[in-house]
């Protein structure tokens, strides 16, 4: 997937990089997966009870999640406001307002699912051009791009649902298998594997004492990120911006992309609080191998909100 945006990126907050060194060392102490579906279902039942109970969870038809995120790009960091809108069974929207270092406008990056349709877009200003290349780095057709986005966004959607309410995307027929025991920092953890179509696979770690979900892990290609400076919108015409974008795309297309490296990704779930009878995580920390890539601090959940009729349509 290619994400093109415009924003200024301040120096990285190095404290983001010091999180969870113990976690990474002990994470793989779980034994090889045991095809014990009954044990996996028992762990899942205990966990769903711990975060609110089956009756409360069954009432959830939608969620709106608001907060602030910080994301690292090498030695740079950017951040802003994030709003996630979910309407079950198959509507999903993420809107990231990327703060632009004091400029009058911020770049709004949007990605969404509306049934089987996937889309993304961006708007606004800034002073940095960043493009994230998908595996292979080749230019995809519009049809290929939409299919790739559908797979990526569906997997992301399911990971958010599992992290928050232990419910995968309803249309995703998943299997649960017991994977053993491990440690997440100082907590003993039960571990289950969740797998489904389109190579969806995630490992979920639950506190053995409280049964609260602590961590998700999965594997995927390491993102390839390229950056270039360009004039800010205040000093550039639309033609200047178009030319800068075309030059960056031409340069990336002419390079031979490396074979994508498969790496481990982690989502650490902390700061659980009560919301309308549910116990929900209010901080999600995303790691690529041992490096913290993003922190998402949630300030507000709204259960079963009323959404505008056209919210999930491409805009």
Task: Show where each model-derived region lies.
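Solvent-exposed loop/turn segments connecting transmembrane beta-strands
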Residues: 73-77, 102, 157, 198-201, ...
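Positively charged n-region of N-terminal signal peptides that target proteins for export
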Residues: 1-4, 12-19
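Short, conserved active-site entrance elements at the starts or edges of catalytic domains
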Residues: 152-193, 214
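N-terminal mature ectodomain segment of secretory-pathway/periplasmic proteins
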Residues: 42-132, 172-180
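Gly/Pro-enriched, hydrophobic low-complexity segments
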Residues: 181-315
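Bacterial N-terminal signal peptides
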Residues: 21-30
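Sec/Tat signal peptide C-region and signal peptidase I cleavage site
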Residues: 31-35
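Acidic/charged, solvent-exposed loop-and-adjacent secondary-structure segments enriched in E/D, K/R, S/T
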Residues: 117-160
